[in-house]
Amino acid sequence: MPRLFFRQLISVVLLLVATRPASAIEVRVSAQALERTLRTQLFNGQQGRYYIRGDVTSACYVYAESPHVTFVQDRIVVHVHAKAKFGTAVHGACIGVSLTTDADVSLIPEAEEESVGFRDARIEHLSESKELNFLLVPFLSRKLPAQMKVNAAVLMRQLLSRSTETTGYALSLGSLKLHSLLVEGDVLVMDADAALKVD
């Protein structure tokens, strides 16, 4: 009788463990991975540029290019190179002034359900030109953080969709809930609960 009870108890425990909705995981993300995401989602125009004003055919324009992501203390720092031609377009040429600068914005990563978000955008470095800064500040403090946001569940599902070909097992992600995102040295550490299925 005690042996039968023990087997039933183990069966119930195993069933409960197997049906738990999610288990804790830790994912470590490099600065280069965030930089690739930024290039894919925002700096995807010709020559890797994002036009803040005008476009590739405009005589007068403002664009940012060459994003570089690093980690400093608890923040993610995005460095961009910006170039502008301010003036009046006359016969396909911009009559005015050309400006070039480097700019930096730092952000704090934030867990948002399934997504990696960013808050507290802080401009660390801007140009000396008030005209250029007038366009760079909204780009750096609002547009860039919004475009860096990544749905981690979608990315993980895309990665797992080819698991049968690469491992012989069909892996799938049922759910993902991000709890925290912290910069630790040269990585962004993501703590989450995830439910994975293996067939």
Question: Which residues does each PLM region occupy?
Answer:
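Bacterial N-terminal signal peptides that target proteins for export
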Residues: 1-10
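Extracellular/lumenal and peripheral-membrane lipid-interaction modules
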Residues: 23-199
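N-terminal signal peptide c-region/cleavage motif recognized by signal peptidases
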Residues: 18-19
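Cleavable N-terminal signal peptides
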Residues: 11-12, 22
